[in-house]
């Protein structure tokens, strides 16, 4: 279900293998200034992920606000948080979105009021080291409790899954906050009951300003969603929001808004269809 400015979309790129001409055709749907952010990648898979990520952003904004692709202006804060520049909507005062990719999937999530962060993970097994050796490289980013839960899992597969899920929650939080790579992930401690009823402790104190969800895309891919009160955004990102303080306005409480539930699977052709139809309409007129 989708409501208002809330969206949850994913694209499976594993079977999408466009020819060079087809790739250029899809790329042409986007404004020219976006092209270098995609073509700078050398590997084909990286280019595919970059292109689909941008297509998701533009297609989502177009669906929510009806803005033609060529008139959509997406800027970034100094920390790298993307935001929509050219709309101010009282219905969606803090419209924001977060894109992510890993493995076979590229996804996007949006919210009209509260902050949103998305992180997709592929539960892939490292090829040159064991799962436990791989996990140990990141021990400094977890609290003692988190590390205990990871390393005391029943087997290495379970340990790897616990590691990825916890890591993904941390990444989703940071992306929602808009802080960029400078935020110390070890400051965050996630507590949960079998990965439900997830709460976050920041510097040892539980925060009531956040809500978290984990979604299983398939047996190898998961998505983490972080939803935060807009007052928690870093200043550069907060300055792009219309409404950060909701005290005394319960009808605007971001956590009373309906959840979007699971993700809707989109195809690349679905993402570009509207833009192509608009171009054909202009040519015909």
Which stretches of residues belong to each language-model region?
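Core catalytic alpha/beta fold that binds nucleotide/phospho-ligands
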Residues: 1-285
